[in-house]
Amino acid sequence: MARPKLWPWGILLLVSLLSAGFNLDTMNVCPSLDIRSEVAELRRLENCSVVEGHLQILLMFTATGEDFRSLSFPHLTQVTDYLLLFRVYGLESLRDLFPNLAVIRGAHLFLGYALVIFEMPHLRDVGLPALGAVLHGSVRVEKNQELCHLSTIDWGLLQPTPSTNYIVGNKLGEECADVCPGTLGAAGEPCARTTFNGHTDYRCWTSSHCQRVCPCPQGLACTISGECCHTECLGGCSQPEDPRACVACRHFYYQSACHRACPLGTYEHESWRCVTAESCANLRSVPGRASTFGIHQGKCLAQCPPGFTRNGSSIFCHKCEGLCPKECKVGTKTIDSVQAAQDLVGCTHVEGSLILNLRRGYNLEPELQRSLGLVETITGFLKIKHSFALVSLSFFKNLKLIRGDTMVDGNYTLYVLDNQNLQQLGPWVSAGLTIPVGKIYFAFNPRLCLEHIYRLEEVTGTRGRQNKAEINPRTNGDRAACQTRTLRFVSNVTEADRILLRWERYEPLEARDLLSFIVYYKESPFQNATEHVGPDACGSQSWNLLDVELPLSRTQEPGVILAPLKPWTQYAVFVRAITLTTAEDSPHQGAQSPIVYLWTLPAAPTVPQDVISSSNSSSHLLVRWKPPTQRNGNITYYLVLWQRLAEDGDLYLNDYCHRGLRLPTSNHDPRFDREDGDLEAELELGCCPCQHAPPGQVLPALEAQEASFQKKFENFLHNAITIPKPPWKVTSIHRNLQRDAGRHRRAIGSPRPGGNSSDFEIQEDKVPRERAVLGGLRHFTEYRIDIHACNHAAHIVGCSAATFVFARTMPRREADDIPGKLSWEAASKSSVLLRWFEPPDPNGLILKYEIKYRRLGEEATVLCVSRLRYAKVGGVQLALLPPGNYSARVRATSLAGNGSWTDSVAFYIPGPEEEDSGGLHILLTVTPAGLMLLIILAALGFFYSRKRNGTLYTSVNPEYLSASDMYIPDEWEVPREQISIIRELGQGSFGMVYEGVAKGLEAGEESTPVALKTVNELASPRERIEFLKEASVMKAFQCHHVVRLLGVVSQGQPTLVIMELMTRGDLKSHLRSLRPEAENNPGIPRPALGDMIQMAGEIADGMAYLAANKFVHRDLAARNCMVSQDFTVKIGDFGMTRDVYETDYYRKGGKGLLPVRWMAPESLKDGIFTTHSDVWSFGVVLWEIVTLAEQPYQGLSNEQVLKFVMDGGVLEELEDCPHQLQELMSSCWQQNPRLRPTFTQILNSIQKELRPSFRLLSFYHSPECQGGCGLQPTTDAESSSPPTSKGASDCSLQNGGPEH
């Protein structure tokens, strides 16, 4: 079967798993982990195999790359909820930290995301080579300025629905060197290619770790060798088809094995493992508390679902009869929000007491009814105080009993105090509420009518238990003003987030009339607050209230701490005494303080917002931002620090002559053109935005979702960032500026991955406004800019943490110009070496050079030279130039684009006659010393020649061509001056191959397009012999489906072999260009069955001709077949593409390169090459045609292919392959060579489906073969006989020839 190529990640994964001792038997489950501030905290992950919950790693500002190099947690294979990384400095990749993390289950998500990587300043790649599945949730990768290798990840291999991923704000793809293993010069074999979001590419996590692509159906995992795991495995396995060898489980894990469903007697827990009933009973939601877990419908749940309950003797959840009894032990629970009430959803029996203190909210009754509507019994007391948001108590629609096991102050079972808007007691009267013991107490409910209270007395049976003071007519249902006494504050102490207040003790006439104090406070920018404490126009309370109990000592002054408060904010505060009077004829007595205004102390501001940058010149950057959301003082200045960043040196690894070049930009931001002023609309004075959306108006779903996530995420960041100490807090700008700058340099000056940014100086400036102009910068250079907000107390509290932005200056126009003049020197008789100096201070990096040269009277030729190629000789060599006058010029291309062309330089290539006369002139004018030198050189040459002639060269076909290094020109010789070179086509097996034009080569044609093969000038004698041998072989071939030799230029250097020009290149490249996702797709549809059979017929015809000429090809493959302009396929020129596709060959035992993936088993075993073995290779070529040139035996190394084929293996049958072609392939791959068809038999089977032009042009239908002769299988030995010059010799040979 065909197996995908699995990069050595598989071996590394296996080694790491073995070294980690991975086994399902040794699984260690850890709870959710929040790791922050210190790298040492990561040690909590040691020995964790599974994190049952979430894993958060965040806010490590002082960490460096060195801190992480010794850390690795190979045991960790899965996280059941989500993985979040945020602002971890120094961490460059996760590949060493979590080398075996295979699964993120996403059982509970972070705002819909299972993987969040946010603002990781030094992260260069995600690097999770073992990750095979993200079961639920999306991926969010945002604002990671160094993060690359995102375009090479196929998220579709990991997620069921990757379309909701959010990957923005990372390093631009054109600035990344996203090179996968085995491509563009990277080490190793190529990774698998897949199509994701319409783009086909190699898939890898890093430049040395491929992404796993398993060949298994339905997304099954696989072993490192590509064998399919058990269907219940997830993320990989160590043995195929073994549920105990899984890295993680697709469904459930129990007793060291994976199961589709939990075994009998066990129950699902957290959607990934099975537990017994005993284990479920021992689980705790909160350590130290009683277990609330119950078993329902085969699942172990933290609580029984609504409508079900668990009794004391069983862990199983039972359906309730009627209203479901659910006992909730709460102790004394305060409900001060809707969220707090939700803890009682479904409760019918509250064992404990409830205190309602709902001061804020809008239309709370429906929400409270969902939470408290089923409550029937409260065993303790019910206390409702200061609940200004309540209008009715109807949400207690089923409340029947308040038992009074515990009471307020030992007396009161129902206690209703100071509820300014309470008007109705709800259904208590009609439902028959019972209060068997204790009193009821109502006070300071000005909107609650007394008749409701008196009626409640009768229903509950409490009439006569309480006195008139406990249901006071003066404070219930009465909004009349009372006589008050002024309370005075005696002290206050303010801090940044709190105020400590004390006031004088109030002594009413009757001490028992004083109940408590209420402190009212609110933000008040202006000193115009009123004492009105009712709801405001938005339905919420404008004042914050704090209930203060009376001090125990009669001499102690009452006081309170108001917290948490906002720094540097003015608050209005007053205090009121809650009193009553027992004397009916006495006026109501009270006490209240005047409103006082207090300022909290300043604190460090939050970070500046919405930083934008732009460049308007090559030496300046403009930066603008908005003030921090919380200034916490008067902003006096902003501290701006900036540092130059090094360019990514990995860009030099790319050959931009062959790879598309997309350059970074430094465009001007149009937002800088706006006028100054607030960009946000001011709210109308005196109005406030209500917290509920206007009826009928909703945000668009996408915008609402995005806005919601951003808001929640920023709230999370704000809460999280206040916990650790800031990484470099400016504690004293004036006295300790130098110390703080040094701390800052350590923070932002950490070496940037791939560069040496720490070598560049950090600049700083203080600016009074929300903008800065940074000058004196280097052209087209990226800078990191950090901005801190500092208020008037910065010398005490420090400045804010930094917000940062990256910006690039504009290019300098002349920076990429090449200095000085272009120089040249003769490298040989037909080549020159052009040299020039690099631009000394370019815009970023120089990526390539372009040379434009032209011969006098001809069109110019443009040659691209990569910087790596330039660096070898400081220029470039122009070879194979016909004689004549030339001019050349050059320009550089940097990250900013093209520089200017240099001035042209002229040079001259002499002709053969001039070379001869020049040599004679030298001989006639040399000095005696020169003559002596020539004599010595001649002697050395003589001895060298004697030695060379004594060397014996072996030939694969020793009788076919003499190994002599002499070449005798014949009728094939073409004068060199008739040849013109146009451009490079590629590298051949002996040297460069060019496209050119030959004049007068063919009768009736003025010029003929040709391909020119060369031999390297430094080639060895052996290589020159082989080069001439190949030319001599081609002279004998005259077949339409074999590439023709047109001539030889053997006089002078270098030697040229002139071939028929095949404009569409080799068949392998042509087939790959027909893939729909190919970037160079010519717009031609995928070959139909008829097209594929036509290609097969043309190749078979060319091979039949070679077989008739007793020639064994030995390297038949799509790469060695050529495609002409009219799409005719011809057998190539035997070796031209070997260097181009070097990875298709394998060196066995130190011998020559072998195309093992195309070779027959007898060739691999015994080195036998016959026409039969060529037929085997023809079958592989058919497979290439059907798959559009996929690599045969994909997924197997060359060594594995060698063993696989020698053991009788063949390529797997292809899906959707035409039956006719599949049968033809199978016949070519018979293990017995004699059972394979000959090429003429192949043509016999398909000739009816070939186009009519085939009959006119083919060898098969030629007179020499007389319409399909039977050809004798040619052995490698027979192929040594030279073919005749007339083409095919004897076509009447019979099959069954000799075989090695």
From Swiss-Prot:
Residues given in the record as ATP binding sites: L985, G986, Q987, G988, S989, F990, G991, M992, V993, K1013
Location, primary (coarse class): membrane
This protein's name: Insulin receptor-related protein
The Protein kinase domain, residue ranges: 979-1254
Compartments reported by the entry: Membrane
A cellular component annotation (GO) from this entry: axon
InterPro entries in alphabetical order: FN3_dom (IPR003961), FN3_sf (IPR036116), Furin-like_Cys-rich_dom (IPR006211), Furin_repeat (IPR006212), Growth_fac_rcpt_cys_sf (IPR009030), Ig-like_fold (IPR013783), Kinase-like_dom_sf (IPR011009), Prot_kinase_dom (IPR000719)
Function comment: Receptor with tyrosine-protein kinase activity. Functions as a pH sensing receptor which is activated by increased extracellular pH. Activates an intracellular signaling pathway that involves IRS1 and AKT1/PKB.
Domain remark text: The extracellular domain is required for sensing alterations in external pH.
Residue ranges of the TM segments: 922-943
Signal sequence annotation: 1-26
Membrane side Extracellular: residue ranges: 747-921
Residues carrying sugar: N47, N311, N411, N492, N528, N616, N634, N756, N885, N898
Region listing for Disordered, in residue ranges: 740-762, 1270-1300
Cytoplasmic topological domain: 944-1300
Domain Fibronectin type-III: start-end pairs: 483-603, 607-707, 818-912
Residue list for modification Phosphotyrosine: Y1145, Y1146
Alphabetical UniProt keywords: ATP-binding, Cleavage on pair of basic residues, Disulfide bond, Glycoprotein, Kinase, Membrane, Nucleotide-binding, Phosphoprotein, Receptor, Repeat, Signal, Transferase, Transmembrane, Transmembrane helix, Tyrosine-protein kinase
Catalysed transformations (reactions): L-tyrosyl-[protein] + ATP = O-phospho-L-tyrosyl-[protein] + ADP + H(+)
GO biological process, one term: cellular response to alkaline pH
Posttranslational modification: Autophosphorylated on tyrosine residues between pH 7.9 and pH 10.5.
Family membership noted in the UniProt record: Belongs to the protein kinase superfamily. Tyr protein kinase family. Insulin receptor subfamily.
EC number: 2.7.10.1
